[in-house]
Amino acid sequence: MDKKKKTSKAPPVSGFLARFRGFAQACAVLLTNPHLPNLLKGQIYRGKGKTVCVPGLNCYSCPAATGACPIGAVQSVIGSSKFKFSYYVTGTLILLGVLLGRFVCGFLCPFGWFQELIHKIPLPKKKLSTKKLRPLRYLKYLILLLTVTLPLIFTNEVGMGNPFFCKYLCPQGVLEGAIPLSLASESVRSALGSLFTWKSVVLGAVVVLSLLFYRPFCKWLCPLGAFYALFNRVSLTGMQVDAHKCVHCGRCAKACKMDVDVTKTPDHPECIRCGMCVKACPTGAVSFRCGLSRGAKEKENPAGKQAVEK
């Protein structure tokens, strides 16, 4: 009898999610931005859909957008209790965090998908790892803190906050908003100034970094990702590892581009539930979970000391 651990597949649902994540991301982008003709007209959709926040980072000013950006909405109304919309936005984000956590980042965020597409562009040199840059991941929590507190301090005469993140740092605003609007409208082009130049530099920097690193904005700068990360350990959607199947080969950790070892911390704040670990696992030990169950706990597994059959 062969002493080596035989390979096996992940549960059907987990395998499906991991295999077709790219398709799910594309569908999420289209559902978030269905008003494609507006891109040619240079017009922003202002229907009832704009009263609903989408889960991922998607600019309100995008001509094709059907919903509001949660970060922009929070900054605009968090400074005053006069706006009932502020309670709705906060409640929506908390609900998404509890239900999905950073699954939103891995499957539903348009800007996250954009960075992944850029990262797939082949370069002469090997893609760089961000493992040595892990301390930078805490920067997004500082940005989240400033994103929430600054609009509380600086409000206009009607109590609306100044959206500092959207105004000075968010590259998605340039990519989805300013660029398509300026291409379609001469008046918008003539109104562009130093702020557009600065944010174009920010977008350009993110594009260059995305060529070298996997989702750098998500890892280091995104306040929305930082918010969802706070819920990763309690969210109903996440990852789990079957200790009885795990052979501790380390393939899942090597496959993870978010620098997470799922066998040690299945619900790590940096995990975006992308499923790369599911595809890499030779024994089907790693899978998605949905619900309160956290799966089998880690314990000594004699098979883990044996080599995995290649």
Language-model-derived ranges and their functions:
Residues 1-263, 269-310:
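Non-ligating segments of multi-cofactor redox enzymes
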